[in-house]
Amino acid sequence: MALPLDFEKPLFELETKIDELRTFSQEKDLDFSSEIATLEQKAEELRKKIYRDLTPWQQAQLARHPDRPNTIEYIRLLFEEFYEMKGDRLYGDDPAIVGGIARFQGRPVTVIGHVKGKDTKENIYRNFGMPHPEGYRKALRLMRQAAKFSRPIICFIDTPGAYCGIGAEERGQAEAIARNLLEMAALPVPIISVIIGEGGSGGALALGVADRLLMLEHAVYSVASPESAASILFKDASLAPQAAAAMGITAERLKDLKLIDRIVPEPSGGAHRNPIGTAKELATALSEEIENLLALSAQELVDSRYAKYRNLGLHCIEDASCGTFEAEATDASGT
């Protein structure tokens, strides 16, 4: 288990005391059941309070938690008969994106998602979830195949952003992302994308042009990381908490802005504390959304998807309550 985040430490310390008391009780054959029950109740109350009152910056930290389930874990928990398919048929494979065919509740689907590693070795192999162009081209190859065989597409988004190394730029990173946006907009099959952790910039958007964009309760979605935004706009990366508050990166804020379609609740304490419970909530949401989308014809899907993205931002034009970055940044920093 990874070290707790700063705001999780009071809960971690209380849970450690409960474990120590339970172990001591068993070793000494003593009955501390009432004391343990009291502490467990306090822990549950503290857990609810901590995760109910998270700031946007704390949400960003939680979205990056090393123990948070990644795409591979959700594939294992949600799908049957997954068969991975590799390579873009142009350059090579990219482990930062995994994809293939599977069954979801008996229905054939195509599954694609960013993958972060669970330890240093795997993070290096997965490039910390930052895809190269071949990753996005592999994803598009699988989407085209899904359209050919009339399979719904389910994408999992969890990336700090597309990799910006020299090799990636030489192989056409911007073109690969743009091509995905263009072709996803016109695919004649249902597309559901789920932000399960970080949704960073164009690297996330390249898997995010969907009929339904879902977001886990403690995930984040933004044009840049809070650190990058603070460095660019405030010339000080240490102001990332203020930038996070101003950027509107949380699921609740994005739902208010009509930029996402549905928030998928996480169990108390977040997905990293209960992956199975999170997967159950996600399975329910995916099942409902797929059924709704399958009721539409191919042309209706494409038309409604086009209208959905043409209307993005109109909410803010028509409703002055959206505010501005400068105003919200000032409120957040108090200056």
Swiss-Prot record:
Biological function: Component of the acetyl coenzyme A carboxylase (ACC) complex. First, biotin carboxylase catalyzes the carboxylation of biotin on its carrier protein (BCCP) and then the CO(2) group is transferred by the carboxyltransferase to acetyl-CoA to form malonyl-CoA.
SUPFAM superfamilies: ClpP/crotonase (SSF52096)
Record's protein name: Acetyl-coenzyme A carboxylase carboxyl transferase subunit alpha
Assembly mode: Acetyl-CoA carboxylase is a heterohexamer composed of biotin carboxyl carrier protein (AccB), biotin carboxylase (AccC) and two subunits each of ACCase subunit alpha (AccA) and ACCase subunit beta (AccD).
Signal sequence extent: none
Biological processes per GO annotation: fatty acid biosynthetic process; malonyl-CoA biosynthetic process
Homology family: Belongs to the AccA family.
Pathway: Lipid metabolism; malonyl-CoA biosynthesis; malonyl-CoA from acetyl-CoA: step 1/1
An MF annotation (GO) of this entry: carboxyl- or carbamoyltransferase activity
First-level EC class: transferase
Classification lineage: Bacteria, Bacillati, Bacillota, Clostridia, Eubacteriales
Main location (coarse class): cytoplasm
Annotated EC: 2.1.3.15
Reaction(s) catalysed (UniProt annotation): N(6)-carboxybiotinyl-L-lysyl-[protein] + acetyl-CoA = N(6)-biotinyl-L-lysyl-[protein] + malonyl-CoA
PROSITE patterns referenced in this protein's UniProt entry, alphabetically: COA_CT_CTER
Highest taxon of the lineage: Bacteria
Record localization: Cytoplasm
Domain CoA carboxyltransferase C-terminal as annotated: residue spans: 38-292
GO CC terms in record: acetyl-CoA carboxylase complex
Record keywords: ATP-binding, Cytoplasm, Fatty acid biosynthesis, Fatty acid metabolism, Lipid biosynthesis, Lipid metabolism, Nucleotide-binding, Transferase
Pfam families reported for this sequence: ACCA
